[in-house]
């Protein structure tokens, strides 16, 4: 990437070391960071989406265990109570649960809990960065193959929500192949779904792509199908918050509709994920993956800057109209062309996933 961007980092400039994170709620209008120094602050940051994106949530959770270890002064039994609070902060992204469980497993036999918690969190974070790079390489090979098949020099990719470096350390998942394509000199244009109601595409993905100098166009969520009908989308790449053993994919609400449109128009639909996003305990994702329901205010209100450049939050609905706000949907495996993972590309079915990830 052009810049040395990070969604989170350890900050030891203060009296006690803390986790510093970009406050993603304020982007793209204001770049600001938050210092997380307590378990409560970590949980709140995850819940209120100061940080978001499956991978980054997992990384914050891992460092949250380190912060909690300092709070309880190395007492493992007390740490288990803090870990549970972090683990339950959001229900859909499996990376969160995986990171907490992995940290607690690694620390169960530790004689130096605080020091080891710091080391293990850094190791998990670094491992995720390497996985992101592998996804970039495998995904870019698909981009190159599609260009070759279509005898084109320019590719149009549609993505939904945000699955770049703000969401997954270090280059993301869905955006990682796009960043790699740019490094290889490929002419890339990205259709960016706005991704209502929180507008992660319009606010975050567009901001990332702007920083990287990648050509992109923000579109209304309902426009993707028309673009596919007109042949203006060569492929779709999205990330995921949880993938079941049979290949069903939970991702930001609206992903399922894009997959249906892609399937109907013969557009390949790819999901980019690290190993930690798989939930092998769930056999049928459509029926079993828990779906987070968030506040209806996210639908009723929208945030932006006015003509004077002032950041405002305004209501766009009748005051007394009810709302429904599920944060995710599940795309059945049959609609997915392939999964782009850190271990290579595989079809979204039980046998291929098991062979690649469980031996």
Curated annotation (Swiss-Prot):
Top-tier EC class: isomerase
Active-site residues, Swiss-Prot/TrEMBL: 241 (proton donor)
Keywords recorded for this protein, A-Z: Amino-acid biosynthesis, Isomerase, Methionine biosynthesis
Site residues by UniProt (Transition state stabilizer): 161
Pfam hit, one: IF-2B
Pathway: Amino-acid biosynthesis; L-methionine biosynthesis via salvage pathway; L-methionine from S-methyl-5-thio-alpha-D-ribose 1-phosphate: step 1/6
GO biological process, one term: L-methionine salvage from methylthioadenosine
Keyword set includes Cell cycle: no
Main function: Catalyzes the interconversion of methylthioribose-1-phosphate (MTR-1-P) into methylthioribulose-1-phosphate (MTRu-1-P).
Classification via HAMAP family: Salvage_MtnA (MF_01678)
Annotated protein name in UniProt: Methylthioribose-1-phosphate isomerase
Source organism of the structure: Sulfurimonas denitrificans (strain ATCC 33889 / DSM 1251)
């Amino acid at each position: 990437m052009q810049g040395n961007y990070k969604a989170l980092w350890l900050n030891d400039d203060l009296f006690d070391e803390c986790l510093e994170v970009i406050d993603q709620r304020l982007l793209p209008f204001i770049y600001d960071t938050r210092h997380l120094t307590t378990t409560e602050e970590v949980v709140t940051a995850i819940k209120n989406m100061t940080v978001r994106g499956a991978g980054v949530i997992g990384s914050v959770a891992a460092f949250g265990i380190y912060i909690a270890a300092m709070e309880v002064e190395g007492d493992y039994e007390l740490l288990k109570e803090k870990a549970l609070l972090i683990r339950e902060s959001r229900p859909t992204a499996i990376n969160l649960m995986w990171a907490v469980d992995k940290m607690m497993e690694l620390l169960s036999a530790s004689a130096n809990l605080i020091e080891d918690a710091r080391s293990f969190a850094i190791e998990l974070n670094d491992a995720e960065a390497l996985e992101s790079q592998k996804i970039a390489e495998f995904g870019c090979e698909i981009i190159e193959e599609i260009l070759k098949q279509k005898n084109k020099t320019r590719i149009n990719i549609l993505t939904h929500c945000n699955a770049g470096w703000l969401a997954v350390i270090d280059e993301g998942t869905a955006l990682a192949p796009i960043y790699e394509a740019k490094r290889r000199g490929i002419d890339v244009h990205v259709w960016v779904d706005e991704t209502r109601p929180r507008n992660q595409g319009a606010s975050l993905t567009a901001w990332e792509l702007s920083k990287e100098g990648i050509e992109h166009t923000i579109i209304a969520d309902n426009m993707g199908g028309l673009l596919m009908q007109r042949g203006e989308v060569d492929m779709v790449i999205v990330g995921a918050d949880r993938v079941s053993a049979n290949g069903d994919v939970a991702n930001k609400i609206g992903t399922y509709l894009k997959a249906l449109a892609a399937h109907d128009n013969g557009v390949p639909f790819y999901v980019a994920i690290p190993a930690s996003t798989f939930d092998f305990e769930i056999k049928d994702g459509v029926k079993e993956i828990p779906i987070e329901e968030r506040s209806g205010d996210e639908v009723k209100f929208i945030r932006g800057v006015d003509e004077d450049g002032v950041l405002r939050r305004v209501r766009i609905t009748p005051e007394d109209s009810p709302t429904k706000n599920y944060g995710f949907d599940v795309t059945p495996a049959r609609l997915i062309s392939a999964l782009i993972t850190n271990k290579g590309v595989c079809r979204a079915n039980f046998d291929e996933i098991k062979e690649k990830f469980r031996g």
